[in-house]
């Protein structure tokens, strides 16, 4: 097996997508190339437990650990969606010792566009 080349990136972007059923965290370099990613499902949670803030924190911890090994010290975070895991992912990166320089909220908000789906009973 060939050795994996060590990547050294001093700063990057973290994209967090929080849907009502799952949380996906991906890390990119400043030009947008994905370096690593994790979701509540890939970390080992299935079904109802994927929705929890704890599972989002575990996924964020996994990405934070990988990013720290790549030498990334500061990140800009882009949050998207209305799921429960947003605050937990921010805390996970802060507790991992990574400096968060900017937090952007890019949740799509319709200006009276399509009709939303019916609420579950």
Curated annotation (Swiss-Prot):
GO biological process, one term: translation
InterPro entries: Ribosomal_uS11, Ribosomal_uS11_bac-type, Ribosomal_uS11_CS, Ribosomal_uS11_sf
Gene Ontology molecular function: rRNA binding; structural constituent of ribosome
Keyword field: Ribonucleoprotein, Ribosomal protein, RNA-binding, rRNA-binding
Superkingdom of the source species: Bacteria
Signal peptide from the UniProt entry: none
Keyword Transmembrane helix part of the UniProt annotation: no
Knockout or disruption consequences: Probably essential, it was not disrupted in a global transposon mutagenesis study.
Gene Ontology cellular component annotations, sorted alphabetically: cytosolic small ribosomal subunit
Alphabetized Pfam families for the sequence: Ribosomal_S11 (PF00411)
TM segment ranges: none
HAMAP family the UniProt entry points to: Ribosomal_uS11
Protein family per UniProt: Belongs to the universal ribosomal protein uS11 family.
Subunit structure: Part of the 30S ribosomal subunit. Interacts with proteins S7 and S18. Binds to IF-3.
NCBIfam families found in the cross-reference section: PRK05309.1, uS11_bact
Function, as annotated: Located on the platform of the 30S subunit, it bridges several disparate RNA helices of the 16S rRNA. Forms part of the Shine-Dalgarno cleft in the 70S ribosome.
Name of the protein described by the UniProt record: Small ribosomal subunit protein uS11
Species assigned in the record: Mycoplasma genitalium (strain ATCC 33530 / DSM 19775 / NCTC 10195 / G37)
Gene: rpsK
């Amino acid at each position: 097996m060939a050795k994996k080349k060590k990547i050294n990136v001093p700063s990057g972007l973290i994209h967090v997508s929080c849907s009502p059923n799952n949380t996906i965290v991906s890390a990119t370099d400043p030009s947008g190339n994905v370096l690593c990613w994790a979701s509540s499902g890939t970390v080992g949670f299935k079904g109802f437990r994927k929705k929890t803030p704890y599972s989002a924190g575990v996924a964020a911890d996994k990405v934070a650990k990988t990013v720290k090994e790549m030498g990334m010290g500061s990140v800009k975070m882009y949050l998207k969606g209305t799921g429960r895991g947003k605050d937990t992912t921010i805390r996970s990166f802060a507790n991992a010792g990574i400096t968060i320089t900017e937090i952007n909220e890019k949740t799509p908000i319709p200006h009276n566009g399509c009709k939303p789906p019916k609420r579950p009973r």
